[in-house]
A protein has these predicted regions:
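Solvent-exposed loop segments of extracellular immunoglobulin-like
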Residues: 50-62, 137-152, 244-258
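Extracellular juxtamembrane-to-transmembrane boundary of type I single-pass membrane glycoproteins
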Residues: 304-322, 336
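Proline-enriched interdomain boundary motifs that mark the N-terminal boundary
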Residues: 21-30, 111-120, 218-227
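N-terminal Sec-dependent signal peptide, specifically the hydrophobic helical h-region
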Residues: 1-34, 38-40, 45-63, 81-106, ...
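Extracellular/luminal immunoglobulin-like beta-sandwich modules
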Residues: 88-111, 186-217, 287-308
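Solvent-exposed loop/turn motifs of extracellular immunoglobulin-like beta-sandwich domains
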Residues: 3-7, 36-41, 68-70, 78-90, ...
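Short beta-strand segments of immunoglobulin-like
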Residues: 30-36, 118-124, 136, 227-232, ...
């Protein structure tokens, strides 16, 4: 091979080698994902291993950077106070590809300003109601998780993964609740959590609503059998009892034939009918009605007054005693003679 041809061959080989080594985009961002609270500082490095660098820098709505003849460029913000920064690292080269751009995976977040519960004044047993979690001024929504708890039991969870809004938003999340009798006075709480993923703070930013105790209303339910049969001896005393559970607390009404020796007393949620010196006039059915605005429960107590010692027996017994005494006294006098 001629010397001139050899030089051309070597030159082409060198050119092709240099082109091959520079024909790739080599942009390295560190850290590759940044999670930063709104208003906090942030520092991110960007670099390349290629040698044919013309300039490097950052495109951003805050603190843009342009550094000629540098393989490293730093985006440094002392206080990130914009939501649409969208920083991109760019590197311009002398050879193809002439420019390479890499967008920073940046998450700017703000914990909720407040979390509260919106609920009806009361719930009715077996009827679906809605308890709403209200989350104010939180960002970004796509990382937000809203949960409703009854005590330590989670009742529901709502996320917003398809919401691309970067700016702070307000979210109202309704949760259906169908209460039981046991839920009366239960404590409900709403928890808003930002699940920010890799690079985010640990534990996740979380805000909890003040607890809310919810009354559950229901009609009265008897705490004892609805039918009872009781007995008392004539002249004896007896107390008939009636009690029920309800919300609001039930009021009691007794129905029976009026008698002078009957007294009604209601105390500590129990209503009683007190009957001293029972007689046949008290022998009847006593109806107890426990009422509130949502219903009534009825209890029937049948009282039987059993007769005492018959008067004829008492008279005969007295006569017998008198005769016995007379005989004894007469015998003593006879012996004395």
């Amino acid at each position: 091979m001629e010397p001139g041809a050899l030089l051309v061959f070597v030159g082409l080989l060198f050119f092709n080698s240099e082109s091959a080594s520079s024909a790739v985009c080599d942009v390295n961002i560190d850290p590759s994902r940044v999670v930063v609270r709104f208003g906090d500082p942030v520092i991110v490095n960007c670099s390349t291993t290629r040698e044919d660098v013309f300039e490097a820098g950052w495109e951003s709505s805050i603190n843009p950077v342009n550094e000629p003849n540098s393989k490293i460029t730093v985006w440094n913000v002392s206080s990130l106070i914009v939501w649409d920064a969208e920083p991109k690292c760019f590197i311009n080269y002398m050879n193809e590809p002439r420019q390479c751009v890499e967008k920073l995976d940046l998450v700017i977040y703000k914990s909720p300003e407040s979390v509260s519960l919106i609920a009806p004044e009361f719930m009715k047993i077996g009827v679906e109601s809605t308890i709403t979690c209200q989350v104010l001024d939180v960002a970004p929504a796509r990382y937000l998780s809203v949960k409703l708890y009854k005590g330590d039991e989670q009742l529901g969870n709502r996320s917003f993964t398809h919401d691309s809004t970067r700016f702070p938003v307000n979210e109202s999340v309704p949760f259906p609740v169908t209460p039981t009798r046991a839920d009366n006075g239960a404590e409900y709480t709403c928890v808003a959590e930002l699940q920010l993923g890799p690079g985010g703070p640990k534990p996740n930013p979380t805000k909890r609503s003040p607890p809310l105790k919810m009354p559950v209303v229901y009609k009265p339910s008897l705490l004892s059998a609805a039918e009872e049969n009781v007995e008392v001896r004539e002249g004896g005393s007896i107390v008939l009892k009636c009690s029920a559970d309800g919300n609001p607390a039930p009021k009691y009404e007794w129905k029976y034939r009026i008698a002078d020796n009957v007294q009604e007393i209601t105390k500590d949620g129990v209503s009683t009918v007190n009957i001293p010196r029972a007689s046949s006039s008290n022998d009847r059915v006593y109806e107890c009605h426990a009422k509130n605005r949502y219903g009534v429960a009825t209890k029937n107590i049948t009282l039987t007054v059993k007769g005492g010692t018959p008067w004829i027996m008492i008279i005969l017994l007295i006569i017998g005693v008198v005769l016995a005494i007379a005989i004894i006294v007469g015998g003593i006098k006879f012996c004395g003679r």
